[in-house]
């Protein structure tokens, strides 16, 4: 299983964002360094950019605001970082992708992180979208 490394500060910031937004899902873009596997991902997450969730039912769905998403992508790249992928939260669900998450995934080879607040301690799951399905990544917080 491929590994995604997440800086401790980045993980803490993702969890804080999820808690602030609960009971609605929150979302954003992950920045850092792509891995060196030729496909570019997974890699290391060192930062995130929050993007407003504009879904009609944000308690159970997420949709990144297109203009804010573009601005987040640009901010990460302008800082000299790579766009590693995207994140969203599951305030009451598991840290694995839902059927809706799979149906809406659009960036092949991108990392999709999910912050789950369902358990006593928050969980961070990571997945790589192949273009057809999600492949689970191991997560190491460093």
What spans do the regions from the language model cover?
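Conserved beta-strand-loop surface patch within small alpha/beta domains used
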Residues: 1-84, 91-142
